[in-house]
């Protein structure tokens, strides 16, 4: 199996990449920045907000093995009430959090089918997909889109008789650069700021490494056809 992960420079993506590298798998990392130095890690420099750049990726060269695709790359965007934003970045947030995963799923589903290889997709979602959080309008919308995309893609693959596995997982509250960004926002713009400071100060943030371990345990379980999971519930 070959593992393809977006957004491996830090946080959850890097932890998942390192987990699989330590297990002896080849890992392809896709993103603008790369911080992993490993013989079995192949960095692919790509701006995942650029549709043309994604479409130009040579996926055919990756499908000599079965594929695990982890769509991890994501951004929170401007943390401010939508009506207070001078230059909303909704387009960029949707491009990275929802459109890039869709394009990669499309590309790899087609190439895996042509090469007679299996495809497993893991889309990293968030509790914000199901709960409106003021000042996170673009992020909430993009993760909701990702969840519907995941379920629809799974049903489409079932219609085609493909054995594609699709998971859309919420990792919980994790100690990542995104959490640091959240804590940097004043409560004037983000009313729930204090809650996230409390998570950090009370040591309630999960480590990215724990998330990687829980994801691995989930993927080792027999596949039930269930798409949505909270990694908090995985022991």
Where do the PLM segments sit?
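Active-site loop-to-helix junction immediately N-terminal to the catalytic Tyr of the SDR YXXXK motif
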Residues: 85, 132-140, 152
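Active-site helix of classical SDR
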Residues: 105, 142
